[in-house]
Amino acid sequence: MGFLVDTQKEGGGHSWGYVRSLVRRKQVDSANGQSHGHQLARALTVPHLVAIGVGATIGAGVYILVGTVAREHSGPSLALSFLIAGIAAGLSAFCYAELSSRCPSAGSAYHYSYICVGEGVAWIIGWALILEYTIGGSAVARGISPNLALIFGGEDGLPAILARHQIPGLDIVVDPCAAILVFVVTGLLCMGIKESTFAQGIVTAVNVCVLLFVIVAGSYLGFKTGWPGYELPTGFFPFGVDGMFAGSATVFFAFIGFDSVASTAEEVRNPQRDLPIGIGLALLLCCSLYMMVSIVIVGLIPYYAMDPDTPISSAFASHDMQWAVYLITLGAVMALCSALMGALLPQPRILMAMARDGLLPSIFSDINKRTQVPVKATVATGLCAATLAFFMDVSQLAGMVSVGTLLAFTMVAISVLILRYVPPDEQPLPSSLQERIDSVSFICGETTSSGHVGTSDSSHQPLIVNNDALVDVPLIKNQEALGCLVLSEETRRIVAGWSIMFTCVGAFLLSYAASSLSFPGLIRYPLCGVGGCLLLAGLIALSSIDQDDARHTFGHSGGYMCPFVPLLPIICILINMYLLVNLGSATWARVSVWLLIGVIVYVFYGRKNSSLANAVYVTTAHAEEIYREHEGSLA
């Protein structure tokens, strides 16, 4: 098909059409991209982004995790556990920084997956993130009233409107406080991004000040008492180095939240500069606070004597500072409020991005003309989260939050590899330009066998190309269809595509085998070997070939570029897959039900209403020419 990207096959029917729809990809938003009507307000700068990142990341978990992880895993080496977890989270942050600056549009990991991988994977990521933010926001809201009760001297001291109540005859405990707070935060978010971010900044500042008080006052007590927590016969690693790493895997989830910054990319004044800085500063500040609090608390009291529920408060109480308990509890409440804002902020933007692409009803894509935020999507998000928070104790579902985040982290790292080695070089054009496309095709001396170019259902790029057949997975064009790629370039892209596939499969096999301790050695060790070999082969191959020249110009050029590619994204993929396979079968069973619902919604609504359903794919080199011809004809 000449310059047109076409892998039309005879036969296959509807089943083949379903497969093709899964791999169609959209372009990075540009001047030629589709108009979205009213736009989001570009009002955010670096301080706003840091406030969003820190507020969404530092929840009340730090006030609890310190005691739990120190008692069960790391002991006095807790600060090192936080450091290792922070470095692991930083790998994902590097990947987010590059993609958010190159593709600065709402939707975060969903948006990047749609551009680099395909519609099917993007839908799964977006659907999983919807679950993550809904349950995450509800769980955070349910945790506020117990902390408020500590300030009021117990649950009996809480006003009736804030206290929990059990419905007579039913095993349901309603939480009015949680629902009220969700509605308050929803109202703030509807007022505008700048107003809601200002409020989050204030709440986050109070939380950070409380943590700084813990660090300063705790250090004073530590030097005064001689740091008894470090003078133990069990040493610095009472559970061994393995315990320290086990602690790192647990506290890694305390760093989840910085990805909320990427969801606001469309509202940042200078995304190419500010997004990488905002993500990096937020993660650095969170890691520093976590480590300093850990150093102080495990030094004030022996790790085995820590209260697993209120480790910081009990540590100060043991040194006759009962009044500090109220201040620390206030910090925990502020942390929960900030985390609630961080959970409810990204979801409307993901709903908006999916609705823009036609995968969800268009009502979610409406942007209020005055406040310049997706008010309808925000209200829908708030209603769902408030209902769950009011009626359900979602603490048992908290593990499902991690699935969405880790899937997003993994896909962002894979997207960086794709962008660097096999970036998409086709663009979807509206079918209204079919006549102009045919005209340019004729001028270029191209001929087609059918007289019309394929639509998106028949036009995508295959990952692996040989002389006999096309394996239809997106990423790479075949040379016959292009007629302009030399063999060496085609070979490079084929090798890169295979290598990325080997890397992902190897990381999964290695993670699964290493985590399956119940497997017989005859199965487990060979599986580890196969996975390790595939992973290493992919890494060596990607390190040995050149990256694609388009990596400098793909998307919005001039932004941040992730260092140490391909090593850094591959390590990121391995870490996230290891954490995913260790979430437990019960968590995966619950998530599978949600994903199955998502598949049904996509098959019966999203696939048919996708904005790419009737798109025509052409190579980037000819897309601009087609647009110029079209604009010239309108002049």
Curated annotation (Swiss-Prot):
Ranges of the Vacuolar topological domain: 70-76, 132-171, 222-235, 302-324, 398, 515-524, 582-585
UniProtKB keywords: Amino-acid transport, Membrane, Transmembrane, Transmembrane helix, Transport, Vacuole
GO terms of molecular function: transmembrane transporter activity
Single Gene Ontology BP annotation: intracellular amino acid homeostasis
Gene: CAT2
Matches recorded under InterPro entries: AA/rel_permease1, CAT_C
Residue ranges, Cytoplasmic side: 1-48, 98-108, 193-200, 257-280, 346-376, 420-493, 546-560, 607-635
Protein family: Belongs to the amino acid-polyamine-organocation (APC) superfamily. Cationic amino acid transporter (CAT) (TC 2.A.3.3) family.
The organism's place on the tree of life at top rank: Eukaryota
GO-annotated cellular components: plant-type vacuole; plant-type vacuole membrane
UniProt keyword annotation of ATP-binding present: no
Tissues expressing this chain: Expressed in roots, stems, flowers, leaves, and siliques.
Record's subcellular location: Vacuole membrane
Protein name (database record): Cationic amino acid transporter 2, vacuolar
Parts of the chain that traverse the membrane: 49-69, 77-97, 109-131, 172-192, 201-221, 236-256, 281-301, 325-345, 377-397, 399-419, 494-514, 525-545, 561-581, 586-606
Membrane topology, record value: Multi-pass membrane protein
Gene3D superfamilies documented for this protein: Amino acid/polyamine transporter I
Cited function: Permease involved in the transport of the cationic amino acids.
Keyword Transmembrane helix appears in the UniProt entry: yes
